Swiss-Prot record:
Core subunit of respiratory chain NADH dehydrogenase (Complex I) which is composed of 45 different subunits. It is a multi-pass membrane protein. The lineage of its organism: Eukaryota, Metazoa, Chordata, Craniata, Vertebrata. Its EC number is 7.1.1.2. Belongs to the complex I subunit 4L family. GO terms for molecular function: NADH dehydrogenase (ubiquinone) activity. This is NADH-ubiquinone oxidoreductase chain 4L. Pfam families: Oxidored_q2. Core subunit of the mitochondrial membrane respiratory chain NADH dehydrogenase (Complex I) which catalyzes electron transfer from NADH through the respiratory chain, using ubiquinone as an electron acceptor. Part of the enzyme membrane arm which is embedded in the lipid bilayer and involved in proton translocation. InterPro entries: NADH_UbQ_OxRdtase_chain4L/K (IPR001133), NUOK/Mnh_C1-like (IPR039428). It is found in: Mitochondrion inner membrane. Keywords: Electron transport, Membrane, Mitochondrion, Mitochondrion inner membrane, NAD, Respiratory chain, Translocase, Transmembrane, Transmembrane helix, Transport, Ubiquinone. GO terms for biological process: ATP synthesis coupled electron transport. The chain crosses the membrane at residues 1-21, 29-49, 61-81.
Length: 98
């Protein structure tokens, strides 16, 4: 396995660990999720370019579009939660609290 793939995989694992460990604030969760999407995008792009998949040339662009949509929804949720509650804690997202 080349060093490039190992580095990208480690970036994905570090982002995943950050998502699992620092999940109290919504902003840190969104940043870790963006890091995961960026590492997936780079891994998919390198794989498509190295293996010359002609049918999968659009896959990195489609993944990038989904990442942009996810970022827009996440930031709108962050603005809504911070305007409503004053903080960006993830525990404020639970609407079933009694």
């Amino acid at each position: 396995m080349p060093v490039v793939y190992v580095n990208i995989f480690l970036a994905f694992i570090v982002s995943l660990m950050g998502l699992l460990i620092y999940r109290s604030h919504l902003m840190s969760s969104l940043l870790c999720l963006e890091g995961m999407m960026l590492s997936l995008f780079v891994m998919l792009t390198v794989t498509v370019l190295n293996n010359h998949f002609t049918l999968a040339n659009m896959a990195p662009i489609i993944l990038l579009v989904f990442a942009a949509c996810e970022a827009a929804l996440g930031l709108s949720l962050l603005v809504m939660v911070s305007n409503t509650y004053g903080t960006d804690y993830v525990q404020n997202l639970n609407l079933l609290q009694c």
